Amino acid sequence: MATNPLSILFVASEVEGLIKSGGLADVAKALPEALVNLQHDARIAIPAYTAIPNVCDDEVILDTHLETWPHTHYQVKKRFLGDNPVYLIACGHYFDRPSMYAENNQAYTDNGERFAFFSAACLDMLPKIGFQPDIVHANDWHTGLVPFLLKHRYGQDPFFAQTKSILSIHNAVFKGVFHYDEMQCLPEFHCRNVPDAAVSSTHMTMLKAGVMNADKINAVSPTYAEELKTELGSHGMAWEFQQRAGDLVGILNGCDYSAWHPDTDSYLPINYKATKQSMVRGKNGCKRALQEQVGLPVKDVAMFGMVCRLTHQKGVHYLLPVLTEFLKLDVQLVLVGTGDPLLAAQLRDVAAQFGEKFVFVEAYNNQLAHLVEAASDFFLMPSEFEPCGLNQIYSMAYGSLPIVRGVGGLKDSVCDYDVNPETATGFVFYEPTAQALLITMQRALLLYAQNLTELRRVQLYAMERDFCWNKAAEQYVELYRSALK
């Protein structure tokens, strides 16, 4: 019985291959794909944003309405993403807009209502299309109401008698807090009388609604699961996560090696494998190509890379105070990112002063992001917090040793050289200071300068680490089965 295939509906606000703004989209594609590889029936549900290419041409499999909702009419469209069926919930009132969440850096004022509708429609459609999942897997605040609705409304329907809910926490900073007046669209939001509803006297917090009602909860790394039980790590929801501690686990995200592997990466001028000769030739060629592309002197020098959003979370505020001192060393640094205008202005000032050593590319470019990973000897991720992180995993695959702060998924995936050289895959610091980052960068540079043979050994060892999605998917299956017991 334990080996019976499971049926799963993976509910998310975005999915790579259709529409994407962040890492959630990568998980929404890769995890269902891996579940199908393990012989489970995994289907995806997302809103039918008009920004999705050719969404108007998708097959309509359901034309219906949602009772008690002001804008009741919706359609379910269907397409495939690889072997995964995708259900697209179409409602022009909510999703016929230029982008997913915001315009001109202003969030849509009805985002709470939009994603409440989407959550309700995902459950409402299931009996109508005849798909009876064992598990409904919600993700972040956008679908936090799915476990709430399943428990308090749809749970009374015999169709859902055996269906359990999972909530994945990708980033608890974003909670989906909306005024109660905005959430009157369905009777079930009159939930002041529901003891575990995430409602204050004036507001509903959609992520709390999910946390308090999901059958099981997972964070996207084991360390992040522990951090969520603290005020600092949960950003104000420690009590809720402590209450659900027995149902909270951490599962490290996998890596999509079909998109991120130096042997097959079409963005690279030279592909390379995890052998010393191939790696050295490939990384040297990629370093030269990066130097030429961004206008740095072409020379054999320790290359540091960083690709990130310019935000407090990504730790740019740790780099800036020591950047000038660091650039006095024999190094080059390429930083690619957009975001906070104040951080960007400071980076531009340093780049103007150290043009022979530091280039700041204020734009995201996928080709350049891949090339930086391959060309770098070391990759900077000094994050304030990092639920999982993927660039450190990409870096290891490309033989670029990550320099990380020991938080969240960074702590779970990177082994520090000074702690155990034999199993090291990078460099780790813990103290949240610029000086701690500088010392760690200097440690890395010392290895490059004094023992290049040892550096190559560590790089090869890092390249051989395996963070494939099938491993993570097996852990999710265990979580699903525990919810069904």
Swiss-Prot record:
InterPro entries documented for this protein: Glyco_trans_1, GS/SS, Starch_synth_cat_dom
For biological process, the GO terms are: glycogen biosynthetic process
Positions contributing to ADP-alpha-D-glucose binding = 20
Q: Which domain of life is it from?
A: Bacteria
**EC supergroup of this enzyme:** transferase
Catalysed reactions, as listed in the record:
[(1->4)-alpha-D-glucosyl](n) + ADP-alpha-D-glucose = [(1->4)-alpha-D-glucosyl](n+1) + ADP + H(+)
Q: Which UniProt keywords apply?
A: Glycogen biosynthesis, Glycosyltransferase, Transferase
Q: Which Gene3D superfamilies match?
A: Glycogen Phosphorylase B
Would the keyword Glycosyltransferase turn up in this protein's UniProt record? yes
Q: What is known about what this protein does?
A: Synthesizes alpha-1,4-glucan chains using ADP-glucose.
Recorded protein name is Glycogen synthase
State the species of origin: Vibrio vulnificus (strain YJ016)
